[in-house]
Amino acid sequence: MTKQTEYKRKPEWLKIKLNTNENYTGLKKMMRSKNLHTVCEEAKCPNIHECWAVRKTATFMILGAVCTRACRFCAVKTGLPTELDLQEPERVADSVVQMGLKHVVITAVARDDLKDGGAAVFAETVRAVRRKNPFTSIEVLPSDMGGVEENLKMLMDAKPDILNHNIETVRRLSNRVRARAKYDRSLEFLRRAKEMQPDIPTKSSIMVGLGETREDLIEAMDDLRANNVDILTLGQYLQPSKKHLPVLKYYPPAEFAELKEIALSKGFSHCEAGPLVRSSYHADEQVRSAKEKTAEAK
């Protein structure tokens, strides 16, 4: 039995209860009516039913639904992106009002076809949400925007409450998992964000189950802390289709608990770790925890 077939069957702890109550169906209709996209749907997130039906939260995906990159773990469509929709920021802001969100996550496809990587629309979306929802905390989850400092500055000047950028995997596997992104470029992106706005918490996420070792994960944690990242999320990689990378290991909940303890011992202010954890999972709790610890440190 090979590693690839050994883990083909999902373990019990990955089975989730589907809840499609009126909150879920209502949010889905609203997204379609406003021509908005969510990473919850596009990336086939396993928590969509909990977030939409129970917590009534969602992660908006701006700049279209087509990504210029083709990372081997991701279910988002790739190809030639659509034209920029300059009305999108206002529609996102209106949706946040309609949903009554206390915390919103704004992410985007990679737009390597744009000189600014989509930074201007990203920043305007933050400002639009802030104008119409002054008490809503805002988390942004951008691509590396080509590693261009001016693009990052444009986004950070909009003053989101938290900057999230995912390294996705460990250094050893990075080129295979996300060939058009660079591990060290992502670390530099996170470091520069903290240098530009020291009071804004930074965050990153790692998927497990792609062939990494415990030592690889500890190295990645150390790399993130060396670049002043505050929050870490750890979750199980799930293969979106047979065309994507296979799952080489399903981590049990107990192992996630061990990894969380290691992460906290490294100095992360908050770590969310579990089989179904994704970057935006319980994001409102993460930002609250990080801000409380930042205040305590002053």
Curated annotation (Swiss-Prot):
Q: What is this protein called?
A: Lipoyl synthase
Reaction(s) catalysed by this chain's protein: [[Fe-S] cluster scaffold protein carrying a second [4Fe-4S](2+) cluster] + N(6)-octanoyl-L-lysyl-[protein] + 2 oxidized [2Fe-2S]-[ferredoxin] + 2 S-adenosyl-L-methionine + 4 H(+) = [[Fe-S] cluster scaffold protein] + N(6)-[(R)-dihydrolipoyl]-L-lysyl-[protein] + 4 Fe(3+) + 2 hydrogen sulfide + 2 5'-deoxyadenosine + 2 L-methionine + 2 reduced [2Fe-2S]-[ferredoxin]
Q: Which CDD domains match?
A: Radical_SAM (cd01335)
UniProt GO MF annotations: 4 iron, 4 sulfur cluster binding; lipoate synthase activity; metal ion binding
Q: Tell me any Pfam family this protein matches.
A: LIAS_N
* Chain sites annotated for binding [4Fe-4S] cluster 1: 40, 45, 51, 280
* Keyword Iron-sulfur in annotation: yes
Please state the gene responsible for encoding this protein: lipA
Out of the domains of life, which is the source? Bacteria
Indicate where this protein resides in the cell: Cytoplasm
List the GO terms this entry assigns under cellular component, sorted alphabetically: cytoplasm
Which residues does the record give as [4Fe-4S] cluster 2 binding sites?
Answer: 67, 71, 74
